[in-house]
């Protein structure tokens, strides 16, 4: 017999949550990506969202290896299984991949980072706050809104501070861009953390941090071009490595490269290329949305 919410092809995991009383209704699909599908759900009088993670077979395994470097397994048996690549190890790695976002949300929320409020993790489904705009509609992504110069500067300052707070928690988003930031009535909200990176344990941590900051700078620099001449990522990473970065550390956006050990022109060219690529990708997304 069909379930009463089946007209929207509700995933079995959400039907389980309905049967267990965690949620009362699946309202509609919100979005579907490579890693997960997100649904608007109702729990009592509250409207929330439920993130249903896709199975390992539907996602890129090799891509996840780089992000998972440095993450702690929950026990020695699990660590050995992951290392040997056994079936149990792959299941354990899958569980760790899903749990990483849940753990990060709680940790970052407690550290003052503006993320969706988590409401629990049930049967592989993350139930959390549905971020809305001032009118109560689903909040747009940062890459979908037009800003004036003052707003762009304000949002950039807010997001740089969020990245600093994440880094002080030992975490790097790993895939941060204008399309992983929602614009709520109180400002930017950072979303999507399944690929969260260990700042101390991942050899690519610095590269990923700089990419995150450069993506934001390239996007917001469209509205406030002088942001493109700032070096917040390099500055905060240097302070982090020196053990001097605090959640409220005042940053200048200026950074002096050591020309004795660094190819300064090469570094600047690489960063500018990354920012240009981020801008090109954003423009491509906007054109695709316009065509749709």
Q: What feature does the model see in each segment?
A:
Residues 124, 180-183, 233-239:
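A glycine-rich phosphate-binding loop feature that marks nucleotide/adenosyl-phosphate handling sites
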């Amino acid at each position: 017999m069909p379930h009463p919410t089946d007209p929207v092809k509700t995933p079995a995991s959400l039907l389980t949550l309905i049967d267990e009383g965690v949620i009362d209704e699946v309202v509609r699909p919100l979005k579907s990506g490579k890693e997960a599908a997100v649904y608007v759900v109702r729990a009592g009088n509250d409207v929330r969202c439920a993130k249903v993670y896709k199975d390992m077979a539907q996602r890129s395994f090799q891509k996840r290896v780089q992000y998972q470097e440095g993450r702690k397994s929950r026990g020695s048996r699990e660590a050995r299984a992951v290392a040997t690549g056994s079936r149990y190890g792959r299941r354990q790695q899958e569980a760790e991949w899903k749990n990483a976002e849940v753990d990060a949300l709680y940790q970052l929320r407690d550290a003052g980072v503006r993320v969706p409020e988590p409401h629990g993790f049930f049967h592989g489904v993350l139930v959390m706050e549905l971020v809305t705009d001032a009118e109560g509609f689903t909040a747009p992504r940062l890459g979908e809104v037009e800003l004036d110069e003052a707003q762009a500067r304000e949002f950039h300052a807010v997001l740089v501070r969020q990245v600093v707070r994440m880094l002080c928690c030992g975490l790097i988003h790993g895939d941060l861009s204008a399309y992983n930031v929602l614009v709520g009535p109180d400002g930017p909200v950072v979303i999507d953390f399944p690929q969260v990176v260990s700042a101390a344990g991942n050899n690519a941590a610095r590269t990923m941090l700089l990419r995150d900051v450069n993506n934001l700078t390239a996007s917001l620099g469209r509205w406030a071009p002088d942001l493109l001449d700032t070096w917040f990522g390099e500055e905060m990473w240097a302070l982090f490595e020196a053990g001097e970065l605090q959640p409220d550390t005042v940053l200048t956006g200026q950074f002096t490269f050591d020309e004795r050990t660094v190819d300064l022109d090469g570094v600047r060219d690489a960063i500018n290329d990354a920012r240009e690529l981020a801008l090109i990708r954003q423009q491509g997304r906007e054109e695709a949305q316009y065509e749709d």
